[in-house]
Amino acid sequence: MNAIIIEDNTIDLLNLESLLSKYFPEIVILGHATSVKSGIELLSTTKPDLVISDVQLPDGVSFDILNQLDSFPFQLIVISAFDSYAMNAIKIGAIDYILKPATRVTLENAINKAKVQVDQKIRMEQ
């Protein structure tokens, strides 16, 4: 499964990358972005199965990225230090919402949900 991370906080980004490489070696990180603008650019040049995104970014919120896309053919995991964005994340189609800091258990639960959806999509395309 290919993934991108959209996170502006270096510590949180390093934590996510560490958890993914240690516990989810099957996930290939295609790149990371630190803003709405760079997130849109990264999505235009990659085809991720999974996007893990912080909500609050320097130039907006992650939902701004999704609003600028015609569709999003990837699974979305939203991460935030605030629970107030959870309903928006679910309404927009996120597979899960994780409160920071992400842990192995919370990330594993979210990734397992995403894997089910990605596998289902692959089977339907065959």
Residue ranges and their predicted role:
Residues E17, H32-L50:
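Acidic, metal-coordinating helix/loop segments flanking the phosphotransfer/catalytic sites
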Residues K22-P25, L43, Q68-L69:
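Structural motif
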Residues D8-N9, V55:
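Generic detector of well-ordered alpha-helical packing
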Residues E41, D49-E125:
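CheY-like receiver
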Residues M1-N2:
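Non-catalytic signal-transmission and effector/linker regions of two-component phosphorelay proteins
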Residues N9-T34:
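Two-component/phosphorelay signaling modules centered on CheY-like receiver
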